């Protein structure tokens, strides 16, 4: 896989004089909690506000996140603070819903990264978009698994000519 510096332009467009900082609550629990934290971070070095909307849990019955209602809270964060917004997506349906809510940055969490099937389904949904996607390291230290996820996402970009032309 060839490194393409043009794919980095979204980061350069932020015109940062400091490292990129992404911050926010691990889990969005209430609208007021999300908005309060976002306003507290607004005048800091934070460029991207993050909040977990869907929380993958090992056992059913534990808090699994507020779901898509939380995406409306993130939209409010962007409107009120000007911060870019991001959340974790764990499957193709999450991506579709996040795209419908114009979430700026998507991240694929460590649990999803370990499944090539999930990463491919997410990549397929992202075709014809110019969405920024971050891929977390897998829960087990397997560099080839992580690299495979990057290749799947990168291939999605390469085979999407309009989006690739816009981003390069």
What are these regions (language model features)?
Residues 64-86, 125-128:
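Alpha-helix-loop-beta-strand connector modules within alpha/beta enzyme cores
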Residues 84-91, 104-115, 132-141:
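Catalytic beta/alpha-barrel core
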Residues 45, 99-107, 125-132, 154-158:
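Glycine-enriched alpha-helix->loop->beta-strand junction motifs that scaffold or abut catalytic
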Residues 25-35, 136-148:
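Active-site glycine- and acidic-residue-rich loops that bind
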Residues 159-168:
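Single conserved hydrophobic/aromatic residue that forms the stacking wall/gate
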Residues 20-34, 62, 86-88:
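Active-site mouth loops of central-metabolism enzymes
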Residues 1-22:
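N-terminal amphipathic alpha-helix/helix-capping segment at the start of soluble metabolic enzymes
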Residues 50-68:
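Glycine-rich, proline-tolerant flexible connector loops at the mouths of alpha/beta enzymes
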